[in-house]
């Protein structure tokens, strides 16, 4: 399977735009309504994700479930942060509906368009002029007594960790059926390139460019300093067995979780489903890194020494 791709070309304009918002944010109704009106004036039809519509009271537009958006919309514009985009991305996985991330608050790695810039870049993007990136997803299942008890998708990461405040978890990690190591730690992160700038980064993992399709294993506060992050090929299957743990759980993009017992196995592999992120023409991933991570190598806005 080929690596995630980044492409830029003039394509067919979008006709129906779904709006998804971080509806728990106070005051988001105004920006959402303004964005919807602007898209209508630009010549596209607008629908709202149902929970966004109900929570904000913006009921003057068709309100669709994620499944219905997958069938009826051509593109989804997400107003919020990376967490909002993560949630809808998993729901739309497999529907071939690309996502445009508009940031409402701090700049995100995926919601990379500032709200104040949206009216200057959105017409071109909805008209078919944009840069597209395909991002891989992880699929994971929890196996107990040889029977799957839980499964979920993740765009960022699958995290096995201790839930309580005391004690470590002991994990036995295998890759493609080959035993790798036993690890005593606060947990283990299995991350995509997309997730390498999230929890994995704060745990000491490397940054992977989003067009890379490998996985990275990142221990969380390991007991042994020799347990280091390792990058694996895209087709690797990672199995994590809980050897001992007082109170452990597995999280998927830190948005859904299930509790674990000793003997449980968590199997993580690349999903056949992907998502597509759209950016304005001229999008610069390194500029996003510089702004988010405060890499102040250049003292001026025009990147000159």
Swiss-Prot record:
It catalyses: NAD(+) + ATP = ADP + NADP(+) + H(+). Its EC number is 2.7.1.23. The active site is at 82 (proton acceptor). Signal peptide: none annotated. Coiled coil: none annotated. It is an enzyme of class 2 (transferase). It holds the Pfam family NAD_kinase_C. GO terms for cellular component: cytoplasm. NAD(+) binds at residues 82-83, 156-157, 184, 186, 197-202, 221, 255. GO terms for molecular function: ATP binding; metal ion binding; NAD binding; NAD+ kinase activity. It comes from the Bacteria. It is found in: Cytoplasm. InterPro entries: ATP-NAD_kinase_N (IPR017438), ATP-NAD_kinase_PpnK-typ_C (IPR017437), NAD/diacylglycerol_kinase_sf (IPR016064), NADK (IPR002504). GO terms for biological process: NAD metabolic process; NADP biosynthetic process. Keywords: ATP-binding, Cytoplasm, Kinase, NAD, NADP, Nucleotide-binding, Transferase. Its cofactor is a divalent metal cation. NCBIfam families: PRK01231.1, PRK02155.1. Belongs to the NAD kinase family. Involved in the regulation of the intracellular balance of NAD and NADP, and is a key enzyme in the biosynthesis of NADP. Catalyzes specifically the phosphorylation on 2'-hydroxyl of the adenosine moiety of NAD to yield NADP. HAMAP family: NAD_kinase. This is NAD kinase. It comes from Cupriavidus pinatubonensis (strain JMP 134 / LMG 1197).
């Amino acid at each position: 399977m080929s690596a995630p791709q980044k492409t830029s070309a003039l394509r067919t304009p979008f006709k129906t735009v779904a709006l998804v918002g971080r509806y728990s944010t106070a005051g988001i109704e105004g920006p959402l309504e303004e964005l919807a009106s602007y898209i209508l004036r630009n010549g596209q039809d607008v629908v709202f994700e149902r929970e966004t519509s109900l929570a904000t009271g913006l009921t003057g537009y068709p309100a669709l479930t994620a499944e219905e958006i997958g069938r009826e919309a051509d593109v989804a514009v997400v107003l919020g942060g990376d967490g909002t985009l993560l949630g809808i991305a998993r729901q739309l996985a497999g529907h071939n509906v690309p996502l445009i991330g508009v940031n409402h608050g701090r700049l995100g790695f995926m919601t990379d368009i500032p709200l104040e810039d949206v009216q200057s870049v959105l017409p071109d993007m909805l008209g078919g002029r944009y840069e597209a990136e395909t991002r891989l997803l992880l699929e994971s299942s929890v196996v107990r007594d040889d029977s799957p008890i839980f499964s979920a998708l993740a765009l960022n990461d699958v995290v096995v960790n201790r839930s309580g405040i005391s004690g470590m978890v002991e994990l036995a990690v295998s890759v493609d059926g080959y035993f790798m190591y036993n690890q005593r730690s606060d947990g283990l992160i299995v991350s995509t390139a997309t997730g390498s700038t999230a929890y994995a980064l704060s745990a000491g993992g490397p940054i992977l460019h989003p067009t890379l399709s490998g996985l990275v294993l990142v221990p969380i506060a390991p007991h042994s300093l020799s347990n280091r992050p390792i990058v694996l090929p895209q087709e690797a299957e990672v199995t994590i067995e809980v050897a001992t743990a007082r109170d452990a759980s597995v999280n998927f993009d830190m948005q859904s979780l299930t509790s674990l017992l000793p003997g449980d196995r968590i199997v993580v592999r690349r999903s056949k489903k992907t998502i597509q992120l759209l950016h304005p023409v001229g999008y610069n991933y390194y500029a996003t890194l510089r702004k988010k991570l405060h890499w102040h190598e250049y003292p001026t806005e025009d990147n000159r020494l």
